[in-house]
Amino acid sequence: MAFDEPACHTCETTLVSRLFCFSCNALQPFPREIDFFEVLGFPVSFELNSAELEERYQQLLLELHPDFYSSAPEAEQLLSETASAILNTAYKTLHDPTLRAGYLLHLLAEKQQLDESSLPEGFLAEMFFLQEELDELLDSVNSVELSAMHDDLQNRKMNIEADYVPLFKKHDDHPENSEILQQLQSHLNAERYLRRLLERIPTTD
């Protein structure tokens, strides 16, 4: 489990999600500092089964929906609204590989001081070159070359994303090595650069 297997405050059944008990259908009080893996009941790991994540989200979305608690006591209505909001944020974060990587890095780094502006060696110079190239293509409105550049940037982004799994596994094997977390931070920074460049390229229908 992603947490220390707390029990339902009503029936004492071990919880899947910290937000709701599927055994007795009771909303659960939860701590202010709750991590998103606890919310959806998954181990703290970068690798997630996307189908299981979607299924768990839909289950909880239905059970927590405020409409079901419209006639409940005010405290329970508020708990439902808060839990639903947290659920949506948790799902959005864990569903997206980049957001999940950034969130997991935040959990793992704890009080470590990471260089949040670091980039892979040579990446920044390459980005300056690509940015100038993109500026020229946007000025010329060359749709063919813009499309080719979009594909190139997308491939670069996917290559960075492909490194997340082995890097997180490496950290699992060597949790004392802070350099691995710094590598992950650099990869995330690089991917943000690429995303910003991609966002500048007009989409075509």
Residue ranges and their predicted role:
Residues 1-205:
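C-terminal accessory/regulatory regions appended to core domains
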